[in-house]
Amino acid sequence: MSHLKPKIMTGAYDAEKLRRNLQEQIALEEDELENQTDFESNKEESNINNNPLVIKQEPSIYPIEINLEDLEKANGMEEDWENSLMKIIESSDVTPKLSWNDEFENCTYKGYVVSSEDLCNDSGNQEKNEVPIKQSSLEDVAQVLSLFQIRSEVDYKIEKDNKNQVKIIKLSKQDKSVKSKRNDVVNQDSDKHMKYDSNFDAVMDQFQKGIRIKKRFGKGYVKINADNMPGTYHDLSNVISTVKGEKTVEEMIRYLFKKSKRFKSINKTLNIDEMILC
């Protein structure tokens, strides 16, 4: 029955070697698990980046720490890091301050050279007031200047060039010829205003007294005065200002009935040729 007895196998083993084998096996399994985790995270990140519906966050910007020792070594200085740090701060200023002369010295604006001297109005007796404009805009500019009582050949003169442009140059007030022209123009304007004012006053004075105009149909006269006249003072003023030449009060009133829209409305029922001044 010897063949039925189990064989007992015994042998010696190295416990230290077995411990090292177990540690190596554990370390190998941990490496495989870590590699698998990194692969899955990279795959997930690539899927997120490729997904247009996911909002990507911009990388944050952190301040850079300056190592003072490295700064001193790089600049070859000893214990002078304050000066180097100030240079870094000054060089990082994005809005440097410029003086007026530095900013406008020989700068160009739309093709014209502008110097700092031209920007200053206090240039002695030589006034450099020139405004270049296009020839097509001259009429509009002159009309605007006339609204401010600025007259050609009196307050300014016009010079043309070969570039389809003109210059409006301010005339000096010290020029005697310009001064005489200015006085003549002012006197002419004052005469016109006096004439206009006298005409307006004469017509208004007559309306205060009243006028009688014969009816076109029927008998009798219609009395018109300042209280019942159809036009307004503004309307009357605009019409009287267009009267040319010497006119009598009766002629100016007839002119008023022909030119004023308000007076025209009653002109059809009146015979203005038969008028009596009260």
From Swiss-Prot:
GO cellular component labels:
host cell cytoplasm; virion component
On modification after translation, the UniProt record reads: Phosphorylated by host kinases.
Keyword annotations from UniProtKB, A to Z: Chaperone, Host cytoplasm, Phosphoprotein, Viral RNA replication, Virion
The compartments listed are: Virion; Host cytoplasm
Q: How does it assemble?
A: Homotrimer when phosphorylated. This trimer is stabilized by binding to the L protein. Binds soluble protein N, and ribonucleocapsid.
Known function: Non catalytic polymerase cofactor and regulatory protein that plays a role in viral transcription and replication. Stabilizes the RNA polymerase L to the N-RNA template and binds the soluble protein N, preventing it from encapsidating non-genomic RNA.
Q: What is this protein called?
A: Phosphoprotein
